[in-house]
Amino acid sequence: MSIFPIVLALLLIGLEETEALDGYPLSKINNCKIYCPDDDVCKWTCKHRAGATNGKGDCIWYGCYCYDVAPGTKMYPGSSPCYA
């Protein structure tokens, strides 16, 4: 039996969920969602890291998940910005 399938499976499991540059995990479903431990951190993360605003500079978040990433924002190296 080859060890290759086992190694490949472990790699794929590890790639299911990645971390953003600030260490918070990106959602598996929608990279626009950013988990934050509390409202203050969530607001700061939306405004400074994700650029998640309503076009007026106000941060948009719900349940400590940030949405509506501004155009041109890089969520993770090599990935395109997403729009909620």
From Swiss-Prot:
<dbReference type="GO" id="GO:0090729">
    <property type="term" value="F:toxin activity"/>
</dbReference>
<keyword id="KW-0738">Voltage-gated sodium channel impairing toxin</keyword>
<feature type="domain" description="LCN-type CS-alpha/beta">
    <location>
        <begin position="21"/>
        <end position="83"/>
    </location>
</feature>
<feature type="disulfide bond">
    <location>
        <begin position="36"/>
        <end position="59"/>
    </location>
</feature>
<feature type="disulfide bond">
    <location>
        <begin position="32"/>
        <end position="82"/>
    </location>
</feature>
<keyword id="KW-1015">Disulfide bond</keyword>
<keyword id="KW-0732">Signal</keyword>
<keyword id="KW-0872">Ion channel impairing toxin</keyword>
<feature type="disulfide bond">
    <location>
        <begin position="42"/>
        <end position="64"/>
    </location>
</feature>
<comment type="function">
    <text>Inhibits voltage-gated sodium channels (Nav).</text>
</comment>
<dbReference type="GO" id="GO:0008200">
    <property type="term" value="F:ion channel inhibitor activity"/>
</dbReference>
<keyword id="KW-0528">Neurotoxin</keyword>
<comment type="similarity">
    <text>Belongs to the long (4 C-C) scorpion toxin superfamily. Sodium channel inhibitor family.</text>
</comment>
<dbReference type="GO" id="GO:0005576">
    <property type="term" value="C:extracellular region"/>
</dbReference>
<dbReference type="GO" id="GO:0017080">
    <property type="term" value="F:sodium channel regulator activity"/>
</dbReference>
<dbReference type="InterPro" id="IPR044062">
    <property type="entry name" value="LCN-type_CS_alpha_beta_dom"/>
</dbReference>
<feature type="disulfide bond">
    <location>
        <begin position="46"/>
        <end position="66"/>
    </location>
</feature>
<protein>
    <recommendedName>
        <fullName>Toxin To7</fullName>
    </recommendedName>
</protein>
<keyword id="KW-0964">Secreted</keyword>
<feature type="signal peptide">
    <location>
        <begin position="1"/>
        <end position="20"/>
    </location>
</feature>
<dbReference type="InterPro" id="IPR036574">
    <property type="entry name" value="Scorpion_toxin-like_sf"/>
</dbReference>
<keyword id="KW-0800">Toxin</keyword>
